Amino acid sequence: MSEHINGKTVLITGANRGIGKSLVETFVAHAAGKVYAAVRSLDSAAPLVAEHGEVVVPVAIDLGDPASISAAAAAAPDVDIVINNAGVLETSAPLDDNAVASLEYELKINLYGLCHMARAFAPVLAGNGGGAFVQLNSVVSMKAFAAFSTYCASKAAAYSMTQSLRDVLREQGTHVVSVHPGPIATDMGDSAGLTDIAEPASLVGDAIIAGLASGAFHVWPDSMARQLGGAYQSFAENVVEADMSEA
């Protein structure tokens, strides 16, 4: 159990599978008082409720539907920690016939969905003392791979937005966290052909718990992420995490 999680109310998008499901398990294990399992179909959260009981409360969120996000924020006024985990991945190289369509779809969910989540839940977090907003980005936010280039572009955009959210939300006392997993053992990882090098999803939750405790902005959950993070850290500390003043 972590004292900084004990009794807190957490909302996790994409909670019914993959990293999201693992995050629910992690926060329940760390004695969160309530975990809103945000899913597109409420029925998909039934196994989580069956396993964990009334601590898990299903709520409907589709990151492609801003109205559902606003409704969820109204239905969950007690949230202390928002974890925006849900996302989509298309395997599109830059010149593929489906590249533009893939990019439009991925931006709608991975970037615009982030913006809608932040706009809807920032007032909720402010009303509950600031709390934390955790965004699941990726190592591909910083290093692109041609086979799923449009996904990389959408996550790079989401990382840029997360940096801006950090600056804006600190004014209301909200701790913003940018999480950058490498290959993780999920359906999404399998679809990207990363099964052989994937690491357990539980690493992500453990790293987020540690990042919330330490006040970190960047979180590197797995071995590939830590390797990239080590190379990136000097730049991050001097540019990304620095308060830049006008010359």
List where the protein language model places each region.
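Conserved glycine-rich cofactor-binding loop
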Residues: 16-17
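Conserved glycine-rich Rossmann-like NAD(P)H-binding loop of the short-chain dehydrogenase/reductase
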Residues: 28-47
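The beta1-alpha1 cofactor-binding region of Rossmann-like NAD(H)/NADP(H)-dependent oxidoreductases
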Residues: 60-71, 100
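Conserved mid-core segment of classical short-chain dehydrogenase/reductases
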Residues: 89-104, 147-150
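Active-site helix of classical SDR
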Residues: 118, 154
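Residue(s) in the substrate-gating loop at a strand-loop-helix junction
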Residues: 138
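SDR active-site lid
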Residues: 160, 164-223
